[in-house]
Structure formats: C-alpha cells, structure tokens
Amino acid sequence: DDLEVFHHSEIIAKLQKEGKLPEAEKNGRSITFHDPCYLGRIGDILDAPRSVIGGVDKETERHGKDSFCCGAGGAQMWMEEDADKRVNEIRAAEIAETGCDTVAVGCPFCSVMVKDGLDAVGADMEVLDVAELLWEQIVARDLEIHDKTKNRTGKARIWKSSLSDLV
C-alpha cells in the first residue's frame, strides 16, 4: 500500500480554499519565508506555504528551489562547524537582509536553526511556523467572535470544532 504524504502547509491551504480555515491576514507583519531544503528542492512545494501566510513581503536572495540550507540538513545540526562558517548564521544574515520583522518556516529544524542564527547575527526577527501564523489569526478571530457573542449574563457562547469537522 502506498501512502500519500502531505506537508502541513498543503493541508492548511486546501482547508483555506474550502473555507474551513480563515484566509491569511498579516495583521501588520512583514513576512519572508525560509524554504526548507526537502520541501522546496525535493518536494517542489513552494506555493502552499506562501499561500497559507498570504504571500511574502520580500523574498530572500536565495529562495524557492534555489534556497540556502538553514544548517540542519543532513544532520548538520549536531555537528561542530568552524565559528566563522556557521551555515545557520550565513542563512540568518540573508533572512535579516529582507528587512522583514517575521520569518515563516515550514520545518521544526529550520525553526531552531534560524532562531539561533538570527540571535547570533543580532537580528530582531520573530520565527514562526506557517501553522503558528495561522493559529494567531484563528485565536484573534475567536476572541473577536467571543466579544461579539457575550449574552446578557456576561457568558460567551463558545464556538468549537474538531479536526474531523475540518477534513
């Protein structure tokens, strides 16, 4: 039996298209996206993560199929590198050059490596997975709904859904 595997950004994008998840809103953020090596170069999944976050405000110099590794690929994360040649710091400097305040990622290893690299180069950027950016929107929307639906006793009607309602 063959199993079809999807990246979470593909599932989120599908659910957004079907109206089961909200469309992306940047809420004042300027966003760039770091393409994970396997996602972009091997999986050719370039559009879904960008769609989920409402597009990018500025691409890094090397992006898409030509993206540069975060430094975790091939188990690099656990190897010692020369202090002046750390891959994650090189990549972080490229990301910081975009001038964006947020970098979206689609891989937990990339998240760790990019955060560490940005700290090392002194860049003040937030690193969030595409799903975390969407989650922020859902929470903000639900708080807005909560405020609008308070009844006279001050209690709120809570909207609930489960994953089975979405797929």
Regions found by a protein language model. Name each.
Residues D1-V167:
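Iron-sulfur cluster-binding electron-transfer modules in prokaryotic oxidoreductases
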